[in-house]
């Protein structure tokens, strides 16, 4: 929902997707869900193009090719943080820092980009602590002979500039570092969290 909501709020219409081309169940589920949500819940938005990558090293080149082919793109969904950073580098070189990015996984580089008011506008963060708890509970149930699901997952958190610092604490169980907090405060669009 993060990218669709951002695009609606800012009057954007055209987006592209950059997704992993491998048989990884969780990544495929996340990518397919993102595309489905954008298509079904934001029908006024237009998917201009989709590219797939085998490894992160291809993303820089594929981002450049996608934007050159579809210069009307105003936003991108990208599978996870590493490829998103590659896309940011390509877009910066192309002078297209106006393109909004939504991605998966909260890490320092994408958090810093968001804190500084960069291209990352929304992301879906995994909750590793809670995932560990859920898996441990499933293991205990299995040992006790109780039925357990074939796949154990935990709902991710949507992270935006408005809740970045709070989400960081929720995901990593610690306060955001001083450098990240300071970058956020130096951003002229800083939103004070309650």
Where are these regions (language model features)?
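Hydrophobic alpha-helical segments within soluble ligand-binding/sensing domains
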Residues: 1-15, 59-60, 106-111, 127-144
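Short beta-strand elements at the ligand-binding edges of bilobed clamshell
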Residues: 1-6, 17-21, 50, 117-129
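Short, solvent-exposed amphipathic alpha-helices that sit
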Residues: 2-3, 25-46, 62, 86, ...
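Loop/turn elements at helix/coil->beta-strand transitions in domains of secreted/extracellular proteins
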Residues: 10-15, 40-46, 71-75, 96-100, ...
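Short beta-strand elements in bilobed, periplasmic/extracellular small-molecule ligand-binding domains
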Residues: 14-17, 35-57
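Hinge/cleft segment of the Venus flytrap/periplasmic-binding protein
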Residues: 18, 38, 131-194
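Extracytoplasmic "Venus flytrap"
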Residues: 18-29, 78-81
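Hydrophobic alpha-helical
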Residues: 34, 52-114
